[in-house]
């Protein structure tokens, strides 16, 4: 019985560590600007981009290995991005060139 309890306890601890591993971040787009210019996250963390603006945005990164594109993001929509490797993603808006963000992704 004690072996079974030990295995169950170990499983619960490992599950908690796994679930606690990724963090969630929120970045707001408003007034044709972005709420931060730079952020540091870890691999597998999630960034949710919220369009709290009155205009459409189009965020993307062409950084090798960290590419993504949130095509047309109308006002009120949220989209989440997750990076699977370390590096520095240069994020831009295809519609508003003044929107720039550096995402530093650590291992």
Features from the language model and the residues they span:
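Domain-edge interaction signal
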Residues: 10-12
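Extracytoplasmic copper-binding redox domains, predominantly the cupredoxin/blue-copper superfamily
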Residues: 2-3, 7, 16-107
């Amino acid at each position: 019985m004690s072996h079974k309890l030990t295995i169950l306890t170990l499983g619960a601890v490992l599950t908690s560590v796994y679930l606690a591993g990724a963090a969630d971040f929120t970045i707001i787009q408003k007034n044709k600007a972005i709420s931060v210019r730079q952020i540091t996250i870890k691999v597998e963390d999630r960034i949710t981009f919220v369009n709290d603006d009155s205009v459409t945005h189009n965020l993307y990164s062409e950084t090798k290995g960290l590419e993504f594109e949130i095509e047309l993001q109308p006002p009120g929509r949220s989209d989440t991005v997750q990076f699977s490797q370390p590096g520095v993603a240069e994020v831009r808006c295809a519609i508003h060139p003044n929107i720039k963000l550096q995402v530093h992704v650590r291992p």
